[in-house]
């Protein structure tokens, strides 16, 4: 417990909140270039080959991003738009690629939740 004089000298500092996506620098999205596109295996109870990409952002930071949806057209040097949002079973993956923006194609034959995967409305 500080003394009254210590509080007069220094005061109480409000707690500083830590962001869960620091590379975005308080922006909603950031653009970047894929430096590597590969698959990764998830943590213990799950088993799969998750599609991830290493992306160098316009601010120079390099991050690992998850590519959602079935199938993708990304390769090295593709320009992508990323957003925040971690993948719970992939350690170190704190960002998502936005499907249907820039070089990333939307998911083909997607009927439901289309807006999340950049899929156009099918011709009825």
From Swiss-Prot:
<keyword id="KW-0689">Ribosomal protein</keyword>
<keyword id="KW-0699">rRNA-binding</keyword>
<keyword id="KW-0687">Ribonucleoprotein</keyword>
<keyword id="KW-0820">tRNA-binding</keyword>
<feature type="modified residue" description="3-methylthioaspartic acid">
    <location>
        <position position="89"/>
    </location>
</feature>
<dbReference type="GO" id="GO:0003735">
    <property type="term" value="F:structural constituent of ribosome"/>
</dbReference>
<comment type="function">
    <text>With S4 and S5 plays an important role in translational accuracy.</text>
</comment>
<protein>
    <recommendedName>
        <fullName>Small ribosomal subunit protein uS12</fullName>
    </recommendedName>
</protein>
<keyword id="KW-0488">Methylation</keyword>
<dbReference type="GO" id="GO:0015935">
    <property type="term" value="C:small ribosomal subunit"/>
</dbReference>
<feature type="region of interest" description="Disordered">
    <location>
        <begin position="104"/>
        <end position="124"/>
    </location>
</feature>
<dbReference type="InterPro" id="IPR012340">
    <property type="entry name" value="NA-bd_OB-fold"/>
</dbReference>
<dbReference type="InterPro" id="IPR005679">
    <property type="entry name" value="Ribosomal_uS12_bac"/>
</dbReference>
<keyword id="KW-0694">RNA-binding</keyword>
<dbReference type="InterPro" id="IPR006032">
    <property type="entry name" value="Ribosomal_uS12"/>
</dbReference>
<comment type="subunit">
    <text>Part of the 30S ribosomal subunit. Contacts proteins S8 and S17. May interact with IF1 in the 30S initiation complex.</text>
</comment>
<dbReference type="GO" id="GO:0019843">
    <property type="term" value="F:rRNA binding"/>
</dbReference>
<feature type="compositionally biased region" description="Basic residues">
    <location>
        <begin position="111"/>
        <end position="124"/>
    </location>
</feature>
<comment type="similarity">
    <text>Belongs to the universal ribosomal protein uS12 family.</text>
</comment>
<comment type="function">
    <text>Interacts with and stabilizes bases of the 16S rRNA that are involved in tRNA selection in the A site and with the mRNA backbone. Located at the interface of the 30S and 50S subunits, it traverses the body of the 30S subunit contacting proteins on the other side and probably holding the rRNA structure together. The combined cluster of proteins S8, S12 and S17 appears to hold together the shoulder and platform of the 30S subunit.</text>
</comment>
<dbReference type="GO" id="GO:0000049">
    <property type="term" value="F:tRNA binding"/>
</dbReference>
<dbReference type="GO" id="GO:0006412">
    <property type="term" value="P:translation"/>
</dbReference>
<feature type="region of interest" description="Disordered">
    <location>
        <begin position="1"/>
        <end position="25"/>
    </location>
</feature>
<dbReference type="Pfam" id="PF00164">
    <property type="entry name" value="Ribosom_S12_S23"/>
</dbReference>
């Amino acid at each position: 417990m500080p003394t009254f004089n210590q509080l007069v000298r220094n005061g109480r500092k409000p707690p500083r909140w830590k962001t869960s996506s620091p590379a975005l620098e308080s922006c909603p999205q950031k653009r970047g270039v894929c430096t590597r596109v590969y698959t990764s295996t998830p943590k213990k109870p799950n088993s799969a080959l998750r599609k991830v990409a290493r992306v160098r952002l316009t601010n120079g930071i390099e991050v690992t991003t998850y590519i959602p949806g079935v199938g993708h057209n990304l390769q090295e040097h593709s320009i992508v738009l990323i957003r925040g949002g971690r993948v719970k079973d992939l350690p170190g993956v704190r960002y998502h690629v936005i499907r249907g923006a820039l070089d990333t194609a939307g998911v083909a034959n997607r009927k439901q939740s289309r807006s999340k995967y950049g899929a156009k409305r099918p011709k009825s």
